[in-house]
Amino acid sequence: MPVTGKLEFDEEKRASWFSHKGEIATPSYYKVYLAEHDVVTEMTPTERAVLFRFTFPENEHSYIVVDAFDKGSYVKVIPEENKIIGYTTRNSGGVPKNFKNYFVTVSYTHLRAH
């Protein structure tokens, strides 16, 4: 989840208000403004993945919180490549027993782990 300001890991505390009136939702594109964090969030699907783009305000306190806190997850921060890689096995059902949801993030600014 894209957040700004004080880094917050609690889901309830980092939640953001948004308006359905400001959403754009089509089968090939989704866009929403997260008001609490002043972040524009966009996503578009591919055949087997989704691409996200977060547009943050210009400040020194912008983050992407990756929820990978259970025993079925793996996260690796590669600061020299501005990249985060990993996977989670969390799901809502309807997937094979060995399911893993892999992710790769690439930042065009510097990255660091917290």
Regions found by a protein language model. Name each.
Residues 1-3:
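Solvent-exposed N-terminal domain segments of exported/luminal and surface proteins
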Residues 8-45:
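Extended, loop-rich substrate-binding clefts of extracytoplasmic carbohydrate-active enzymes
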Residues 30-33, 41, 52, 83-89:
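Generic recognition of long tandem-repeat/solenoid scaffolds
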Residues 34-73:
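Acidic, contiguous internal or C-terminal segments within carbohydrate-active enzymes
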Residues 39-43, 75-77, 102-107:
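Broad, structure-driven detector of short, well-ordered beta-strand segments within folded domains
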Residues 70, 84, 97-99, 103:
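Catalytic and substrate-binding clefts that recognize carbohydrates or anionic sugar/phosphate headgroups
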Residues 72-91:
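An exposed acidic His-Trp-rich patch
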Residues 109-114:
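Conserved small/polar residues in nucleotide/adenosyl-binding loops
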